[in-house]
Amino acid sequence: AISDHVMYQLKEMNPLFSKVIFISNSQLSEKYVSVLFSKDLIQEFIQRENIGYDFAAWKAGLELEGLDNLEKYDSVTVMNDTCFGPLWDIVGYYEKYENDPEIDFWGMTNHAEVKGHNLYIPEHLQSYFISFKKRLATSNVFRKFWESVVAHTDVQKVIDEYETQYTKIFMKAGFAYTAVLDTVPIHQDYFHRNFTIHYPQVLLDYKVPFIKIKTFDLSQHLSPYTLKTIEEKSSYPIDLIDSHMTSVSIPTPAYLLDRKVIEPSNKIVSVDKKVAVHLHTFYVDLLP
């Protein structure tokens, strides 16, 4: 199946692109693929084995189109389905960055450099959303990078060899990038470097149009605020978040419980079947 938030994302972003290649690393039935085509949400579909994660999938998409054919496009965007969004109209972001002659590739957030005793992570544009402009997409360094991508089975290898490295490779070749939220100037004021997981409120303050799905479970203490802010300050259908997190987070996390309260009804219902209720109460003093 295709999650509703993915369908929404495709619908909202489709007008931006002259061609959309949808790549699935999990098996999709013909029924769902047909829906994508019938609604004109995609132009090409790739069903592939679940190896290599997003970078190998993007490579497959680029190979299908042909790296030599990228010349006919103004830009090439790669993204995955690890986010909810767009929270706000995405057109303005494209107009801003695509029309900036100083920028060759851009995305939502970056990760500041980390220098530790046994750890080094270079500054990099986080890869859940990247848009490459023509000058970079038609370059030799772009071709060489994607030709080097291997379908690793270990996600950490994908992170170490591709996600954290591609920014440095392209910058070394003379290309410049930017992010909607540039964390480099502000990261010293925060304990964690990965803002997408730990500081969703900062992403919302900077109007980053995508919010990572896993931030809701990994930063549950912030999730009520995150949901409330999205509901009040964006037009994003909040039920897409509620329903998806309910289906992937079992048991239902505490931050969703107040959204599942059933309104009292005076309607009398007659049921001829026995109903068992299992109520687990940790604090018995909370019982009436």
Question: Where are each of the predicted segments found?
Answer:
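ER/Golgi luminal nucleotide-sugar-dependent glycosyltransferases, focusing on the catalytic module
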Residues: A1-P288
